[in-house]
Amino acid sequence: MILADLTTPAGIEKLVQVTGGTQSYYNHPERADGIATVVQQAITANPNLAHVKVRLMPNLPNAFYNYDRGEIILGVVNPDALAHELGHANNLRQEGLYRKILNAANGVARINNVVALPAMLALRMFVQDPERRDDILKSLSAVSAAIAAPGLLEELSASTTAFQHAPNKLRAVGTLGPAFMAHMATSMMPSAIYQAGRP
């Protein structure tokens, strides 16, 4: 399926069938008509988006943009969530320095998320000088925040785009706000871990 298929009744029907008709926090089958509107607006603004691949996933309680494959993974009927992912697709389908920086930062951030706690614990155990340990942890915290910044800015950009195009701003905040806060918590966790390890 490609994005343009979600402007047709058949595409919308398939989305609802695959993702399930039950309502949950993110899944709102009764808002299916809003999907076509969001997609049409995005394609009108950037016709290249019409050919973005869309993979429908049952039992996925959300949606995301797969940077590596350039496709939207959609598991919910939610125009606001889709508009957010379309923001990513619009930003990241443009080749260039932005995408390279974002991919590199995301790769380093994933590694940092795994090593932050063991690194902090190792520093607490093996670096006996409190001032030196504090300087190292403070530096690691700052570097971690800098590494997280490009990903957070991309999330903010996609959420802002989705909010601007949302017909119901309050409902959009209810969808986009918690998702952004979850991204921020995950992204800033290594920085917080290094801060927590300071004397």
Give the ranges of each region predicted by the language model.
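ATP-binding/phosphotransfer module of carbohydrate and carboxylate kinases, centering on a glycine-rich
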Residues: 53-55, 98-102
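Coil-to-alpha-helix initiation sites in intrinsically disordered, low-complexity, charged segments
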Residues: 95-99, 168-171
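Auxiliary, metal-adjacent structural segments of Zn-dependent hydrolase domains
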Residues: 2-79
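Short acidic linear motifs
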Residues: 11, 83, 131-135
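Long, well-structured alpha-helical subdomains associated
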Residues: 106-156, 160-199
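Active-site recognition of the HExxH zinc-binding catalytic motif
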Residues: 80-96
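Catalytic phosphate/metal-binding cores of nucleic-acid and nucleotide-processing enzymes, i.e., regions
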Residues: 71, 75, 102, 109-111
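Hydrophobic secretory-pathway targeting helix
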Residues: 1-10, 139-142, 148
